Regions:
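Redox- and metal-dependent alpha/beta enzyme cores, enriched for Fe-S-associated oxidoreductases
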Residues: 55-82, 95-102
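Residue-level recognition of beta-strand->loop/alpha-helix junctions
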Residues: 88-90, 149
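Conformationally flexible catalytic loops at phosphate/diphosphate-handling active centers
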Residues: 1-50
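Solvent-exposed alpha-helices and their adjacent loops that cap or buttress functional pockets
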Residues: 51-54, 103-105, 138-139, 172
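Peripheral docking tails and interdomain loops at the edges
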Residues: 110, 114-184
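A general structural motif
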Residues: 29-45, 62-69, 90-97
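An N-terminal assembly and electron-transfer interface module characteristic of large anaerobic redox
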Residues: 8-16, 91-99, 121-122
Length: 184
């Protein structure tokens, strides 16, 4: 009888790393199918989509339903002369730093990353850490980066929380870590 792993430790690591080319090729495949969907439905899905002022100085990076809530707040604030926006993450893994940098306004001075998870004991949540690595590797060390959590357990995140976040980003030194919608 054969039991356990089908490969020994001497080759497992090598096989695991050999998968990298498949993951690295995936974004191009996803983009191809997004283009087909966009053509049929009239949408504009990409790996990352930006919404807001083209010269925004305060930008949120998030994924999921919070993006629709943020859109409404962005429309309101930009109509009043503010310069805010959001980067919507459409493909999270594999992470494509170049695609994020392509849509992030060059004028962004402060970026708040919203994660819908809590990673106890970590320096930050997954999306925050990916954005942080992207900015640092691109040499964008002057961009103030903050990270927060929202919506755990389906906790509602109303527009007032997004208003409060953009207000916080106006400060010279906004909170580095935060939560939206609860008192913590």
């Amino acid at each position: 009888k054969m039991r356990g792993s089908h490969e020994n430790g001497d080759v497992f690591f090598q096989h695991r790393e050999a998968c990298n080319s498949v993951y690295n090729a995936l974004p191009a495949v996803v983009e191809k199918y997004m283009a087909k969907i966009n053509a049929k439905l009239g949408t504009n899905y990409d790996l990352f989509n930006y919404y807001g002022a083209p010269d925004a100085d305060r930008v949120i990076v998030a994924m999921g339903s919070i993006c629709d809530v943020a859109d409404e707040v962005i429309d309101y604030l930009n109509a009043k002369g503010e310069k805010v926006g959001i980067v919507k993450v459409r493909l999270y893994r594999p992470w494509v730093s170049a695609s994020l940098l392509k849509v992030l306004p060059k004028t962004a001075k402060k970026v708040a990353v919203l994660d819908r998870t809590k990673e106890p004991g970590s320096l930050g949540e997954p999306l925050y850490l990916d954005v942080a690595a992207t900015l640092r590797e691109a040499g964008l060390n002057d961009v103030v980066l903050t990270g927060g959590r929202y919506g755990l357990g389906s906790k509602d995140t109303p527009p007032s929380s997004i208003f409060a976040l953009y207000k916080e980003l106006e400060k010279d030194q906004p909170k580095e870590r935060f939560t939206l919608g609860i008192t913590d």
